[in-house]
């Protein structure tokens, strides 16, 4: 309901978004910075993620231990994550501790000191994260897949960076990055829960006053390229990832047409891929599809793992299902897909963690809050021809594939 939503701008331009949920006893806080891996140049690969780690490692007023103790003292859950388009610092606390949580978040965003000792320690932590990534076949095949989709463009690179770039970062690099991207024009503070909007604005005005106004970040537009990649690794199964140019955030009607297509094609146990590949042929335990949306680009992805000697048959059957998907969609399939999408959306509205992220992402992408009722209206207006047309547009494009398995499957 839009009447529960409020938005204000502080004197420095910081956007404050709240959604009142009076029936809960907690608040969920998201501080969204419009910066991620796609904003980095070649020398900065991995700095967004490294900076997110460093935010918890000491400020002008708190040591790393004191930050951890301050979080634990109010019994909250705090963390952060980095994507290609956003870096998000989030917390969930009891409503009575909202001001204390905001105080900690404001401190780590505005007053981090980036000591040489902590940089050296966190470098080792991230190197372990990269090593863990290299030991995970799913991570490897998806990294290869996105590298082929976007090649040397920022969206095709890992958010973790490389050992070479990470080793070059100093406190000056972090301070310069903060100065460029962590400003009022580029940050969104979104809060959902049992709160009073006006009180939040007053608190935020006090805590975030040192943020400079700044300018919104920009990035180089992404271009889907595509291609084929292979990783030679001896595993129990071969994993296959197929993809096509998908749908971006820009057009919500097209986006939700693609969501419905994905549900029908590979989004659940009644989906075509699941029924054909797993239930009928027994070729894979896990198989499915989804659309990854970015601001100006999208990737429609199909994934499955199978026995080494079944890869060719798996690929053939997926291709057969793709052809069928471009020809017809039944009324029953559309109804099931809409019900799934509607149920997921409506049940998510009950969680303040979801609402906080939803209003923040809405504003950072669209510059406005798009209500669940507006989204449902879009979903319910979609017809069979819309889904078939979307399928034809997506599946007629350049294919990208990535495979991880034994060397004799290369170029199967």
From Swiss-Prot:
Gene Ontology terms for molecular function: metal ion binding; metalloendopeptidase activity
Active site: 52 (proton acceptor)
InterPro entries, per database record: Metalloenz_LuxS/M16, MPP/UQCRC_Complex, Pept_M16_N, Pept_M16_Zn_BS, Peptidase_M16_C
Coiled coil regions in record: none
EC number, UniProt record: 3.4.24.-
Keyword Plastid: no
Binding site for Zn(2+): 49, 53, 129
Obligatory cofactor(s): Zn(2+)
The entry's keywords: Hydrolase, Metal-binding, Metalloprotease, Protease, Zinc
The keyword Protease appears for this protein: yes
Entry note: cofactor: Divalent metal cations. Binds Zn(2+).
GO BP term (any one): proteolysis
Annotated PROSITE patterns: INSULINASE
Similarity comment text for this entry: Belongs to the peptidase M16 family.
Protein name listed in UniProt: Uncharacterized zinc protease RC0293
Species of provenance: Rickettsia conorii (strain ATCC VR-613 / Malish 7)
């Amino acid at each position: 309901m839009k009447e529960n939503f409020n938005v204000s701008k502080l004197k420095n331009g910081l956007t404050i978004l709240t959604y009142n949920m009076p029936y809960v006893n907690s608040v969920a806080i998201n501080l969204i910075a419009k910066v991620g891996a796609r904003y980095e140049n070649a020398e900065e690969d991995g700095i967004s993620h490294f900076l997110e780690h460093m935010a918890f490692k000491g400020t002008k007023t708190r040591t790393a231990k004191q930050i951890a103790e301050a979080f634990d003292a109010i019994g909250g859950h705090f963390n952060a994550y980095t994507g290609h388009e956003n870096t998000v610092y989030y917390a969930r606390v009891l409503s009575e501790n909202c001001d204390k949580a905001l105080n900690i978040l404001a401190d780590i965003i505005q007053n981090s000191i980036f000591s040489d000792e902590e940089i050296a320690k966190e470098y080792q932590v991230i190197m372990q994260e990269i090593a863990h990534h290299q030991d995970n076949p799913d991570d490897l095949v998806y990294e290869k897949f996105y590298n082929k989709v976007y090649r040397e463009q920022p969206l095709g690179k890992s958010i973790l960076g490389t050992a070479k770039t990470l080793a070059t970062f100093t406190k000056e690099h972090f301070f310069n990055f903060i100065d460029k991207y962590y400003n009022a024009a580029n940050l969104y503070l979104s809060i959902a829960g049992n709160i009073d909007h006006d009180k939040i604005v007053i608190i935020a005005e006090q805590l975030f006053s040192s943020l400079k106004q700044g300018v919104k970040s920009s990035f180089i537009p992404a271009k889907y390229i595509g291609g084929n990649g292979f990783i030679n690794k001896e595993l129990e199964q071969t994993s296959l990832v197929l993809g096509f140019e998908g749908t971006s955030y820009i057009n919500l009607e097209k986006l939700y047409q693609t969501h419905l297509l994905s549900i029908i094609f590979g989004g659940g146990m009644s989906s075509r891929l699941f029924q054909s590949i797993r239930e009928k042929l027994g070729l894979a335990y896990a198989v499915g599809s989804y659309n990854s949306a970015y601001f100006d680009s999208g990737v429609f992805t199909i994934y499955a793992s199978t026995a080494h000697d079944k890869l060719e048959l798996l690929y053939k059957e997926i291709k057969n299902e793709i052809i069928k998907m471009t020809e017809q969609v039944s009324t029953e399939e559309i109804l099931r897909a809409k019900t799934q999408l509607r149920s997921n959306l409506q049940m998510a509205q009950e969680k303040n963690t979801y609402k906080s992220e939803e209003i923040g992402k809405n504003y950072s992408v669209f510059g406005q809050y798009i209500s669940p009722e507006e989204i449902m209206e879009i979903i319910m207006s979609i017809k069979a021809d819309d889904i078939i047309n979307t399928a034809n547009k997506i599946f007629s494009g350049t294919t990208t594939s990535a495979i991880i398995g034994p060397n004799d499957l290369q170029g199967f």
